[in-house]
Design a protein with these regions (language model features):
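Mid-domain Rossmann-like dinucleotide-binding core that forms the NAD(H)/NADP(H) cofactor-binding site
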Residues: 135-216
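NAD(P)H dinucleotide-binding glycine-rich loop of Rossmann-like/cofactor-binding domains
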Residues: 90-166
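C-terminal hydrophobic helical "lid"/dimerization subdomain
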Residues: 3, 284-341
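Residue-level marker of beta-strand positions
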Residues: 65-67, 82-83, 120, 172, ...
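Short glycine-/small-residue-rich Rossmann-like dinucleotide-binding loops
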Residues: 36, 74, 89, 230-234, ...
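Glycine-rich cofactor phosphate-binding loops and adjacent beta1-alpha1 units
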Residues: 158-164, 186-187, 202-275
């Protein structure tokens, strides 16, 4: 079976490659239905990542956020027509201590390995999770991003002390919104404080206790723990403001990606006995927990609909360029692709 794969071969240059699907494998064949563009995909497309690193990864198909329809399952575990979320992380080994998404040997779709921008996806059964019945497929398309927030919260539960009454989230973008929303449902008794820079975006956090512009935080505000969802050049002031406002022995979850080293106030980290930990990507456990949250709290999907920005029907390569170029101009929300191949 021949599969048409849409690969980025150079920044802003996409071409088709033809690869064979081995039907003798006991794996599921799916057809992508909806996709969502991630900032990492956008950096690759625009050529904004480190050029030497990018050239080692290309050519590759982009997109690691997707919902797909089952076309064929030789084992019969999944039914034809069933809607599933493919897990982009594929471990090649297991470790009793290190999670699958932190193993250096794991393969990740659209990061050196083909993403989901292809006619068909072939995946092992354990790399697929079911979408709850009746859930909005547009929101399901960016379930991977939600699972990244869930992964960070799971690590928070592992490292943070039991003082969890006041939690601060820095960042008023997509990751900040999703992380705050997940905390709202997983810790309904916690007070959530959002720190951002754009009032219009802060207004979306209707479930939070309070929102603050980072340049106008009142005296006396303090938090037990913090999540950094800023990244880029904003990481430095965000992390240092967290260090200033956090209570002793609090934990800080670092989620934002920065291309440059970030200077932080280590003196106060030591003086307060703070715990800083990183979080990246996600694994099967995080996807399952995400789907459980979707199933138990259907209103989460309605909140996440606020993130849906442009929607593009993609039939050919020019449509792909149109979707990526429009997404590049957005500063909030997710671009959803209707894969109509």
């Amino acid at each position: 079976m021949i599969n048409e794969v849409y690969q980025l071969i150079a920044p802003k240059l996409i071409d088709t490659a033809y690869k064979e699907i081995d039907l003798s494998k006991n794996e599921v064949i799916l057809r992508p239905v909806k996709m969502s563009i991630c900032k990492a995909d956008q950096r690759y497309y625009q050529g904004l990542s480190n050029r030497a690193v990018l050239m080692k990864k290309l050519p590759m198909a982009l997109i690691h956020e997707c919902v797909a329809e089952v076309i064929y399952d030789p084992s019969g575990v999944f039914s034809v027509g069933e809607m599933l979320i493919p897990i982009p992380n594929t471990p090649t080994e297991t470790d009793p201590v290190i999670a699958e998404n932190y193993l250096r040997s794991s393969h990740f779709c659209s990061s050196g390995y083909d993403g989901f921008m292809r006619d068909y996806i072939q995946m092992p059964h354990d790399r697929l999770v079911k979408v709850p019945e009746g859930f909005d497929m547009r929101v399901a398309s960016f379930s991977e991003l939600v699972s990244v927030s869930v992964q960070s919260i799971s690590r928070f539960e592992k490292f943070a002390n039991s003082n969890r009454r006041k939690i601060g989230i820095w960042g008023d973008g997509n990751v900040g919104f999703i992380t705050a929303l997940m905390l709202h449902y997983l810790y309904p008794n916690a007070e959530l404080y959002i720190f951002g820079t754009v009032e219009d975006k802060l207004n979306f956090f209707t479930f939070a206790k309070e929102t603050f512009h980072v340049d106008a935080v009142p005296e006396g505000v303090s938090i037990d723990h913090a999540f950094e969802c800023v990244g880029g050049p904003g990481s430095r002031p965000a992390i240092n403001q967290m260090i200033d406002l956090i209570e002793p022995e609090g934990s800080i979850s670092l989620m934002g990606v920065s291309e440059n080293f970030v200077d932080i106030n280590t003196r106060m980290v030591l003086e307060k006995g703070l715990n800083l930990f990183g979080s990246s990507r996600s694994g099967r456990k995080d996807f399952l927990r995400t789907m459980q949250i979707f199933a138990e709290h259907p209103e989460v999907g309605h909140y996440l609909e606020n993130l849906i920005g442009d929607e593009f029907k993609v039939r050919d390569i020019p449509d792909i360029h149109k979707a990526f170029n429009a997404d590049y101009m957005r500063n909030f929300g997710k671009t959803v692709i209707d894969w109509d191949k």
